[in-house]
Amino acid sequence: LSSAASDVYKRQTVERLLHRWGHIVAVGTTSVRTLESLAALAWRIRREGSPDEMRAVGQWELYDIPASYTGREALEELLAYMERNDLGTLKASTQIMIAPLGYRWRIVRAIVTNFHQPKSTLLLLVSAYVGEDWHRIYDYALRNDFRFLSYGDSSLLVNDAPFAG
């Protein structure tokens, strides 16, 4: 999302995410980035007392969150803030980039996504999720004439690596 684009987070959605904890599947890379950005908003609440909805979640902001801060903690903190302030929604925007630089997945457990162009930031996100297996996955797709980009074929990516949730 660009800094001009915004997402609206409903309290009911945060409650549902907690209820389905550990089984959250994001459909599309925008959904991945939106969901993972919740951790940054919650961390702002812990640090600053407010999610500062007027400030976009910065490109590398998620990398500044301590490894010990879990996704469940983040959602609980966000929900408590919304309840305390009688908020039905939060509006925020994100500029995050998820790259294979030691990113700790906090919310998303599986991803449904298209096959992305080489050297794209979306492929970085896929690589951050599945690690070096992205080569094997994309080689298979190329050898079997999968369609790439928005109207192409999709994949279900499930990562069994340790989860910071």
Where would I find each of the regions flagged by the language model?
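Extracellular interaction modules
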Residues: 1-5
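Surface-exposed, charge/polar-rich loops and edge strands
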Residues: 6-165
